[in-house]
Swiss-Prot record:
GO terms for biological process: mRNA catabolic process. Residues 201-261 form the KH domain. This is Ribonuclease Y. Its EC number is 3.1.-.-.
């Protein structure tokens, strides 16, 4: 048993030793294999790194060679430029040297000529002195006395020429000033165009049928009395078909009455209480419209900083008229004319436009009727803090106060231009038509006249004469005779141009 155990132990020990030896052998084999693989891989990595380093070296070498070549090229270019500059400098030095030699030659020549000139000058001085002595001996005057007489003579001649020259300049200035003034006025008129509005002292209110007249009159006339009392307008209800006449000198009252009537007729309820309510409402609307019109006018003209009361007065101009010309349109037209004319004269166009717009504000208020409208307007402008030159332009535009501002004559002229424009102001229609008829009939009384036409609001009369009755020479004498007769027998504004027309027409037909 012991032997078996010993044998087993011996076998176990021998097996362990063999296993250890075998393990060592296998481990060494693996170690050798791994080492060999590592050496092989290291050799590959080494070769790759060497190739990579070599490639970088070659690239760097190529870059350096390019840079060196580029630098060499730049150096070569710089050397070429330097050589060119050296050549230019060399040429300039040669040119300078050549010019220096030429200048020295010219200097020597001038010095030689200067010597000759000095000699000739001495000779001339001697000759002049001799001539002066001879002249003094002949005339019996010294040189100083002769100079004084010559100077006096030249002074008188210069004075005469200067006076003549001054007179010529003054005549030319007068002619030029006249032409320039006409040009400025014409240009101002051409650049300003406004509509002409005609207002009357009555307003016609149209109705759909005459039945409405009875409702407006009311029982025993109470409605019409209430309407007249509320508006201050005379309401004329007569036999005129489908029309009621509103009569009042105050256009604002007429407008209030017209609008109130329109609302009452449209609404259908017409009785004293309703009339008072509608008139009160319309009066507020008209007042708002007046202020809105004033603001819109100042904005359109580019005028700022006006007192609210002045804006209200400007708005009321819409309902005022002067000789049939709407006052607001006249003020706007005058303002634009003033701005254009002031610009042409080198003055402030904004101030001129402001003065032109405000020049007739004295026609609007009803208070102080004893004052002329220009002075009342100046008083209002001063009250509402307008500048002195604008106040003076307002007050002096009808020569009722002294003109101290340059704007005053401009406003005066533009006011006259706006009022005198043909068609701007309305005469009484009957008188206007009668004057035109009288003009035409006056010319028709002459023998040989076949037709007459009064045009341009009666400022031009065209006379057509028969070609077989009057020759060309007689047309001139005829126009003169008609002009003289108009002057002697008629009253008219401005001037009337008479144009006599004589023509012969030959008409044939081609068939």
């Amino acid at each position: 048993m012991i032997a078996i155990i010993a044998t087993a132990i011996a076998c176990f020990v021998v097996g362990g030793i063999l296993s250890y030896v075998l393990f060592r052998y296998v481990l060494k084999s693996k170690y050798d294999s791994v080492l060999k693989d590592a050496e092989t891989e290291a050799e590959v990595i080494k070769k790759n790194k060497l190739l990579e380093v070599k490639e970088k070296f070659l690239n760097k070498k190529a870059d350096l060679e390019k840079e060196v070549a580029l630098r060499n090229q730049k150096i070569q270019q710089a050397e070429n430029k330097l050589k060119q500059r050296e050549m230019v400098l060399s040429q300039r030095q040669e040119e300078i040297q050549r010019k220096k030699l030429e200048a020295e030659a010219v200097k020597e020549n001038l010095e030689a000529q200067l010597v000759i000139v000095d000699k000739k000058k001495e000779e001339l001085d001697k000759l002049q002195h001799q001539e002066i002595e001879k002249l003094e001996a002949i005339s019996g005057l010294s040189a100083d006395e002769a100079k004084e007489r010559l100077v006096e003579s030249l002074k008188e001649e210069a004075k005469t020429q200067a006076q003549s020259f001054i007179n010529d300049i003054m005549d030319d200035a007068k002619l030029t000033a006249s032409k320039e003034a006409k040009r400025i006025v014409i240009q101002s008129i051409q650049r300003v165009a406004t509509e002409t509005a005609i207002e009357n002292s009555v307003t016609v209110f149209h109705i759909e049928s005459d039945e409405i007249k009875g409702r407006i009159i009311g029982r025993e006339g109470r409605n019409i009395r209430a309407l007249e009392a509320a508006t201050g307008v005379e309401i004329v209800v007569d036999d005129t078909p489908e029309a009621i006449v509103l009569s009042a000198f105050d256009p604002v009252r007429r407008e209030i009455a017209r609008l109130a009537l329109h609302q009452l007729v449209t609404d259908g309820r017409i009785h004293p209480a309703r009339i008072e309510e509608v008139v009160s409402k319309v009066r507020k609307q008209v007042e708002e419209e007046i202020i809105e019109t004033g603001k819109r006018t100042t904005i359109d003209l580019g005028i700022h900083g006006l007192h609210p009361e002045l804006i209200r007065i400007i708005g009321k101009m819409k309902y005022r008229s002067s000789y049939g010309q709407n006052l607001l349109q006249h003020a706007r037209e005058t303002a634009n004319l003033c701005a254009v004319m002031a610009s042409e004269l080198g003055l402030n166009p904004k101030k001129a436009k402001r003065a032109g717009l405000l020049h007739d504000i004295g026609k609007v208020p009803d208070e102080e009727p004893e004052l002329p409208h220009a002075l009342l307007g100046m008083k209002l402008a001063e009250k509402y803090k307008e500048k002195p030159d604008i106040c003076n332009a307002i007050g002096a535009h009808h020569d009722e106060t002294e003109m101290t501002s340059l704007l005053a004559p401009i406003v005066q002229v533009c006011d006259a231009i706006s009022g005198a424009r043909p068609g701007a102001r309305r005469e009484i229609v009957e008188a206007y038509i009668k004057r035109l008829n009288d003009l035409e009939q006056l010319a028709m009384a002459y023998p040989g006249v076949t037709k007459t036409y009064a045009i341009q609001a009666g400022r031009e009369l065209r006379v057509i004469v028969g070609a077989d009755k009057i020759d060309d020479k007689q047309t001139e004498s005829l126009s003169g005779e008609i002009a003289k007769k108009i002057q002697d027998e008629m009253t008219y504004p401005g001037q009337v141009k008479i144009t006599v027309i004589r023509e012969t027409r030959a008409v044939s037909f081609a068939k």
